[in-house]
Amino acid sequence: MKKNKIISYFHLNKSQIEKIEFFVAKIISYNQHTNLVGNSTIENFWDRHVLDCLQLSSYIFEKNLKILDMGTGAGLPGVLLSILGYKNVLMIDSVKKKTDFVKNIIKDLSLEARIQTKRIEKIPTVEKDIIVSRALAPLTKLLTYALLYSNKKTTSFFLKGRNVNNEIEMANKKFIFDFKVFESLSCGGGCVLQIKNIKTKND
C-alpha cells in the first residue's frame, strides 16, 4: 500500500503524519551505523514497517490500555502506536543502542511512552492489557514471555510471517491458547496473530 493510501486508511492527521515522517527519517539515518531495520526494506518503508505496525490499531480499541511492546528494536510498533494516541505504551529491548534511539524519539516527539533497556524476562511482572511484538522470536518463545505479563483478560498481537502455521504447531506442544489469524495489510504475505488465554500444558 502506498504512503498516501496508508494516510487515508488510518485517517492520520497532520501532526501524526509529521511525527511519523520524522520517525522514519531518523530510523533511516541511524540505520547507516546501527542496524535497526533491514536495508532492503527501506525503499518501501511505509508499507513494510509503518503499515505493518499501524494495522494493530484495528484490533486495539481503547487508547488507555496498558500495552507492552516486547523487543521493540527501533520502536516498532510501540512508537507508532504512541503517535496514534495510545497513552500507556511500555517498550522493552535489551540492546542499549536501540533503546537510546527510542528514548530520543520519545523526547523529540513528546510521546506518552516509556522505554527500558532490559531483557524481557527481567522486567517487573506487571500484568498488561495488550502485548505486542514484531520480528522478535518464534511463537513458543513469545508465549513464554507473554505468559509472565498476562492475566485472563490479556490479549497478545504478534506480527508474523508465512511460517505462522508451523510456529503455531510447535507452540501447541508446550502451550494451550486461543488464537485467530488475520491477513496482514502490508506486503510480504504476513499476518496478525491474536493470542488469548495462554496456559502451559502442565498447568
Residue ranges and their predicted role:
Residues M1-E62, L68, K97-E112:
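Class I SAM-dependent transferase core
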Residues L54-K128, V132-S133:
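Conserved SAM/SAH cofactor-binding pocket of Class I
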Residues N88, E112-R114, T155, I176-K180:
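Conserved beta-strand segments of alpha/beta enzyme cores
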Residues L90, N163-D203:
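Active-site capping/gating segments
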Residues K103-N104, L143-A146, E169-M170:
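Short amphipathic alpha-helical segments
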Residues A135-P138:
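Short glycine-rich anion-binding loops that position phosphate/pyrophosphate groups of nucleotides
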Residues L143-T155:
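A short glycine-rich, Lys/Arg-flanked "PGG" loop and its adjoining helix->strand segment in the class I
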Residues K153-V164:
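Conserved beta-strand signature within the Rossmann-like core of class I S-adenosyl-L-methionine
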